């Protein structure tokens, strides 16, 4: 059964990353529009120029507000790709209109534990599946490593060195999630160096992590 999808936010990951790359799939808009199991039915974007770009490329309307989108359609899946500081506000507003089957939220889910837990609780009490866009969990190679860990073709303990850039929340968290997927929950974290700040909300610390396995 084909699932309908709406996008909240038409910035880089929402639409722009692959706009001039016709042979690449780097955005939610391109990914859902080319997948046979989904139908892109609309979007929300405050920037009028981006709304016009969306319509030109995907032949679907983008609206300035959630209310206008949901007057037009009630999609099965809502993709939250707006700035991180708006994630809680947007998801809370979605539930004021209806309960979608699933919400796919860009990472990081939030900048603080309080907001992240509030988002998780909102989805839980409303019976809506919440996914955070840590795409490596769906990568065939990653799944093969996971299977080999389960079958003990790869034996623990295991040591990994990860280099990342553009912030621990926005990019480094991909690898923390990958390590927990492979090795289990985080047991302890030791800060080695605080590193530089990346904007107001992110940084690039060096740290040591032990995982339960």
PLM region spans:
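N-terminal Rossmann-like dinucleotide-binding module
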Residues: 1-57, 180
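Alpha-helical elements of Rossmann-like donor-binding domains used by nucleotide-donor carbohydrate transfer enzymes
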Residues: 27, 31, 53, 68, ...
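Beta-loop-alpha module in the N-terminal Rossmann-like domain of NAD(P)-dependent dehydrogenases
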Residues: 58-122
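Short loop/edge segments at beta-strand edges and connector loops
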Residues: 64, 105, 132-134, 190-193
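A contiguous active-site-proximal alpha/beta segment in oxidoreductase catalytic domains
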Residues: 77, 109-171
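Rossmann-like dinucleotide-binding domain that binds NAD(P)(H)
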Residues: 156-213
